[in-house]
Amino acid sequence: MNPSAGGILSPDHAAALPPGPAQDALLKAVTTEISDKGFVLASVDAVVNWARTGSLWPMTFGLACCAVEMMHAGCSRYDMDRFGVVFRPSPRQSDLMIVAGTLTNKMAPALRRVYDQMAEPRWVISMGSCANGGGYYHYSYSVVRGCDRIVPVDIYVPGCPPSAEALMYGILQLQKKIRRTGSILR
């Protein structure tokens, strides 16, 4: 694999490669470029997005039974730390909010307040049927019919409750979305 004019970290190579020959070839190309030139050519967007995808810090907003599956995903069996996902207790330290469960009308202002306390860039994952659209309680007078009416949602994870694997898949989809976005204004 020869480095292109755009550098090793061009948008074509920005996606994470699974272990194997393709990853070995990429690592060899990076090592060769560093030893030849002493530096690696990359766009600032690719480096910033690579750092953001590898260090998502979610703040949990567990409202109902979906929160149990969210805790399950954070435990040792699924080990979200290997994807750079480390749960944080404060919204000021977080860049991802996972809304898991039924959002009531009384809880909606608190959700918005916590979202506003998060630093930019920030993302939201809506987890479960209740957070996505009201779910089982859709016709109740006290339920918000989807948290996207209160905060902008990036990824929807369906299910009642969704499995830990579904949440992991949603986080991986969010990482893909972050890789595709441009973060530096031109």
Swiss-Prot record:
Reaction catalysis annotation: a quinone + NADH + 5 H(+)(in) = a quinol + NAD(+) + 4 H(+)(out)
Keywords recorded for this protein, A-Z: 4Fe-4S, Cell inner membrane, Cell membrane, Iron, Iron-sulfur, Membrane, Metal-binding, NAD, Quinone, Translocase, Transport, Ubiquinone
Pfam family membership, one: Oxidored_q6
One BP term from GO: electron transport coupled proton transport
The UniProt record lists the keyword Iron: yes
Cofactor(s), names only, from the UniProt record: [4Fe-4S] cluster
Residues that coordinate or bind [4Fe-4S] cluster: C65, C66, C130, C160
E.C. numbers: 7.1.1.-
Topology versus the membrane: Peripheral membrane protein
Keyword RNA-binding: no
PROSITE patterns assigned: COMPLEX1_20K
Molecular function terms, GO-annotated: 4 iron, 4 sulfur cluster binding; iron ion binding; NADH dehydrogenase (ubiquinone) activity; NADH:ubiquinone reductase (non-electrogenic) activity; quinone binding
Record localization: Cell inner membrane
Free-text remark on how the cofactor is bound: Binds 1 [4Fe-4S] cluster.
HAMAP family (UniProt xref): NDH1_NuoB
Described function: NDH-1 shuttles electrons from NADH, via FMN and iron-sulfur (Fe-S) centers, to quinones in the respiratory chain. Couples the redox reaction to proton translocation (for every two electrons transferred, four hydrogen ions are translocated across the cytoplasmic membrane), and thus conserves the redox energy in a proton gradient.
Assembly description: NDH-1 is composed of 14 different subunits. Subunits NuoB, C, D, E, F, and G constitute the peripheral sector of the complex.
Family: Belongs to the complex I 20 kDa subunit family.
Protein name: NADH-quinone oxidoreductase subunit B
Organism: Paramagnetospirillum magneticum (strain ATCC 700264 / AMB-1)
